[in-house]
Amino acid sequence: MSETTETKFTPRFKTKYQETVAPALQEQFGYANVMEMPRVVKVVVNMGLGEAAKDSKLVDNAIKDLTAITGQKPVINRAKKSIAQFKLREGMPIGAHVTMRGDRMWEFLDRLVTLALPRIRDFRGLSDRHFDGNGNYTFGLTEQSMFHEIDQDKIDRVRGMDITVVTSAKTDDEGRALLKALGFPFKTN
């Protein structure tokens, strides 16, 4: 029998965090314990589909786009209440979201920072004011075409999305330092 040695693949951003970012954060903030250091816990990509109330095909196309971008199947968000003014009935699909953890999360962050964000037209950097007070960062993208996985010719409708990077940081300064060290392009005011 032949022996096969399986080499475990480690995402580039995860290696960067372990080798350079974590020691730099420990030195900057003076953490005594390794578990005190802020780290990325999960990334949530949310796509609102308000227009799906009129056309159900939009949900399928949005799911295909989110699946291509994130690499996993999204969960459909459904309306909890009926609202007549919005022509919305209880149980109708109004959005989709994906929660990524582990290696898939690190790969997505790598693709987002190195490939997708630089492709945005007139991109001057992310605002550093979108932290929530607990070190989590949320920002919106206006279109899905900046991701290489989306075929430009097959886009039926421009869809935006919200991306939330949840960290274990206790303050916004720790979260900002973590994301800046990972390579997030924040604006310099």
Curated annotation (Swiss-Prot):
InterPro entries: Ribosomal_uL5, Ribosomal_uL5_bac-type, Ribosomal_uL5_C, Ribosomal_uL5_dom_sf, Ribosomal_uL5_N. Keywords: Ribonucleoprotein, Ribosomal protein, RNA-binding, rRNA-binding, tRNA-binding. SUPFAM superfamilies: RL5-like. GO terms for molecular function: rRNA binding; structural constituent of ribosome; tRNA binding. It comes from the Bacteria. The keyword RNA-binding applies. GO terms for cellular component: ribonucleoprotein complex; ribosome. GO terms for biological process: translation. It holds the Pfam family Ribosomal_L5_C. Part of the 50S ribosomal subunit; part of the 5S rRNA/L5/L18/L25 subcomplex. Contacts the 5S rRNA and the P site tRNA. Forms a bridge to the 30S subunit in the 70S ribosome. This is one of the proteins that bind and probably mediate the attachment of the 5S RNA into the large ribosomal subunit, where it forms part of the central protuberance. In the 70S ribosome it contacts protein S13 of the 30S subunit (bridge B1b), connecting the 2 subunits; this bridge is implicated in subunit movement. Contacts the P site tRNA; the 5S rRNA and some of its associated proteins might help stabilize positioning of ribosome-bound tRNAs. Belongs to the universal ribosomal protein uL5 family. This is Large ribosomal subunit protein uL5. The gene is rplE.
